Amino acid sequence: MPSQSRSRDRYGRDSDRDRSRVQPRRRYHVSEDDDDDDDFDDNPRDRRYRRDGYRRAPVDSRAYDSHDDYEVVDVEEEPRRYRSDTERRRERARASPGTSPRKRERTRDSGGGHRRRRTEESDGSQAPQAHRDRRSRTRRDRGLDDEDLEDAARRLRRRERERERERRAETSKHKSTDSSNSSAGLLNANALAKLRAQHEELDRQEQRRAEKEAKAERKRRRKRPAVEGQMRTLDPFPDEVPRGQSKGRIVSGAYLEEGRAPDMEVRLRGGGRGPPRERRWEKDSDGSAPLTPFWKRKKWWWIGAIVLVIVVIIIVVAVVVSNNKKSDSDSDSDSNSGSSDSWGGDKSSLNGLDHDSIPKSAQGTVLDPWTWYETTDFNVTYTDETVGGLSVMGLNSTWDDSVAPNENVPPLNKPFPYGSQPIRGVNIGGLLSLEPFITPSLFEGYSSDVVDEYTLTTKLGDNAARKLEEHYATFITEQDFADMAEAGIDHVRIPFSYWAVNPREDEPYVAKISWRYLLRVIEYCRKYGLRVNLDPHGMPGSQNGMNHSGRQGSIRWLNGDDGDTYAQRSLEFHEKISKFFAQDRYKNIITIYGLINEPYMLSLDVEKVLNWTVTAAELVQKNGITAKIAFHDGFLNLSKWKTMLKNGPSNLLLDTHQYTIYNVAQIVLNHTAKVNFVCNDWVGMIGEINSTSEGWGPTICGEFTQADTDCAKNLNNVGRGTRWEGTYSEGDSTMYCPTAEQRTCSCTEANADPSEYSDDYKLFLKTYAEAQMYAFEQAQGWFYWTWHTESAPQWSYKTGWKNGFMPAKAYNPDYKCGDDIPSFGNLPEYY
C-alpha cells in the first residue's frame, strides 16, 4: 500500500510546495548502507499512482525507491562529484540482475545522450536556451504557472532519489555474502521475475500514453494561432471568383475560424465566434473528441439535402395523386355532366340524374352507369334484381316481338318454320369473344406471346376493362343489325364466353362487362326481327385449345387432372344462363341455344363429351329453355354421327362447320372446281346428315366462308404464315394453291382492298358463297362467319354485301347448284 508521502506527491500537496522558489539545484543520493526492501509492493494497482500525474523521464528505473535517509549534494558546488556519482549509479544499474537487458541498453543510450547534451552545454551551444524556450512555450500553451512547474519538478526529483535508493539496495543484496541477504535474494527470485514483467508492461503502457499525449498535443497545437506578433486579416474577396470556386467558403487556420483575432474580417458562414462552432471547438480543445474533417461534414450535408429532396418529391407526388383521385371522384359525382370523364361515348341519358341514386355499395361497379363507356340504349335506372344470379341492369322493362326482318319471315311472336324454311344467318364473331384475325388491331404492338384473349387481358392488366368495353360498344352497333335485316338475314349467332358470367378471380379476363352488351345485342336483334342463336364460344379450361376459345394451347375441359372440374364449371355456367334466358322476354327471340362451340373430339374422350352433352341439354331444358339445343360435331366425320346421340334429349340440332381452306386437298382446287366440289359433294353430304333415317337428323351449318385462301392476317394464329404461300410451317415451303408448281401463289390480291377487286374476282366470290348457301339450305340452313372484320374482306358478310360479292338479298341468290357455273373470265388462279 502506498505511503502517505507518495499520496501527497501524487496529488501535488507536498509541503515542498511552500519552499522558496530560488534554491540551488540539488541531487539526492541514497546512503550506501540502506538495504531495506520492506518498501517493495507487488500489487500493480497500488503502484498505478506513479504514472497517473506525469510522464516518467526516459532514464528512470522501474525499481522502487526507499524513504530512508539520503544525503544532499549541491551540484553547483560539487559538479564533478555529481557527475561521477551519477555515472557510478548508472553503471551499477546496468550491472543489476533486476534490470532487463533492454533496460540496460536504453540506460546506456540515455546516458550517452546526457553526456552529449552536457558536452554541448559546456561548449556554449544555444541548445539549452532553445530547450528552455520550448519548455516555456509548452508551459504557456498548457496554461501552467511557475509554481505548478516547481511543484512538478520537486516530485520528479523525489521519485528519482527513491528509485536510485531501491536500485542500490537491490545491488547491495545481490553482492553481499551475508547468508540472510543471499537467502533473501533466492527467496525473492520469483518476485524479481514478476517485477521485471511488471516493468516491461509499464514500459508499454508508458509508451502508449506518451503516443496518446503527443497526438493530443499536436491536435492542440493545430487549434492554436499560427501567427504571433502582428495581427493579420483576411484579404477581401475578389470581384470575380475563379470558376469552380465557392464564393462563400473561407479557408483559414483554426485561430481565425474561431474568430478571436480582434481585427479579423470574415463573412458569416459558420465562421467567427458563432455558438455552434465555438461549442464544438471548446469541446475538442481538451483532446476529448476529434474534429470532424470538413469533407465528412460536407458529405453529411449532401446526404441530408438528398433526403430532403426525396421527401419533397414524395409529398408532391402524393398530393398530385390525391388531387387526381379527388378530381375523378368529383367528376363521377357530377349529376349534370352525363359522363364520368373524357373516356366513353354518348352518356346523355345520365343528364339530369343524380349519381347518389346509385347505392354507395354499387358505385364504381358494373352496375354503375357512370362507369360505363356509353349508355346508349341502356336503361340507366339502378336495380339490383337478378335472374339465375345474373343482373338485369340495363334492360328495359318492356319489349316488342311483333317485328319481322323481311316479308319472307314470320315476326318474332310467330313460330319460325324450321325444317321447311332455311335459316339464313350470320355470326357476329369477334365482338364478345375476341379473335385475332377479326380484330388484329387489338393484338398489334405486343410480342408474339399475346395470341388470345387470355394473354391480351393479362398484358393490358388494369386497362383491359376499358379497352375491351370500348370494343364491345363500337365494333358492332345498332346499324349493323339494321343492315343485316336489309341484306335478307333472319338469324344471328352470338358468340360469347363464360367470363361474361362466372370467371374465377385468378383469371385475367374482363369479367361481366360483356354480359351487359350481350343483352343489348339481343335487344337490337329483337328490334329488327332477327332470331338469336346463343353460342358459348369459350368455356372453362378451353374445349379445343384454339385462340377463339379464349386460351390457345392445352385442352383442359374434360381433359387432364382437372378436366372434370372444368366440365362442372361449364355446367354451372349453363345453370345460370339457362335460368336467365328462360324468362318470357326471351322465349320468342332465342330460338337456338348452343351448348358449346367446337369441342375438339379428335383429341377428347368422345364418350365423355357425349355424356356431358346429354347432361347439359337436360339441365337447360329442366330450367325452362324451349329453344332448340345445338351441339357441335366435334370435327368428326359426319357419317359417324349416324349412330351417336340418336336417343338423346329431344329438340337437338347438330351443328357442323364447313371450310375448304383448312383441307389441303380442297384448297388447291381452282375456282371452278371449288364451286363444283360444293355442289357435287357437300349438297349430298348435308342432305344425308340432315335425314333422321339416313343420317343423324336436323343439322345446321353454324360457320362457313366464301374465302378460298387462308391469306387473312392472323387466321392461322398470331404471326403464323399461310398454306397458300407455303409459309405455314417452318422448314416446309410447300405451297397449296392451283399454281403451286409454278410457285406463283400470292396473298396480295386476296388481302387487297375490295375496291381493287376485279369484276371476275367478285363474281367468283359471290358464286362460291351462294353455292355453299344452297348446300346448307338442304338441311336447316346456315350462319356465315362472320358479319364484320377489320381487314379480312372475304370473311366479312357486310363487306361483301356492300361491295357486290354477296347476294343483295340472302333469300334471293343469283346462283344455285345445278345452274351453269358462270365464266370467271381471265381470273388468275394464283389467287
From Swiss-Prot:
Instruction: Quote the biased-composition stretches of kind Low complexity, using this chain's numbering.
Output: 178-195, 334-350
Q: What is its EC number?
A: 3.2.1.58
Q: Where is this region: Disordered?
A: 1-246, 261-288, 325-360
Give the domain of life.
Eukaryota
Kindly list the residue ranges recorded as spanning the membrane: 301-321
Task: State where composition is biased (Acidic residues).
Answer: 32-41
Q: Which residues lie on this side of the membrane: Extracellular?
A: 322-831
Please give one Gene Ontology molecular function term for this protein: glucan exo-1,3-beta-glucosidase activity
Name the GO terms of the biological process aspect: cell wall organization; glucan catabolic process
**Catalytic positions?**
598 (proton donor), 703 (nucleophile)
- Recorded topology in the membrane: Single-pass type II membrane protein
Which residue stretches does the UniProt record annotate as biased composition, category Basic and acidic residues? 1-21, 42-70, 78-94, 151-177, 197-216, 275-286
Reactions that this protein is recorded to catalyse: Successive hydrolysis of beta-D-glucose units from the non-reducing ends of (1->3)-beta-D-glucans, releasing alpha-glucose
Q: What Pfam families is this protein classified in? A: Cellulase
Q: Where in the cell is it found?
A: Cell membrane
User: Major location, coarse class?
Assistant: membrane
Instruction: Provide the Gene Ontology terms for cellular component.
Output: plasma membrane
Please state which protein family the record places this protein in: Belongs to the glycosyl hydrolase 5 (cellulase A) family.
Indicate what this protein is called per its UniProt record.
Glucan 1,3-beta-glucosidase D
Organism ancestry = Eukaryota, Fungi, Dikarya, Ascomycota, Pezizomycotina
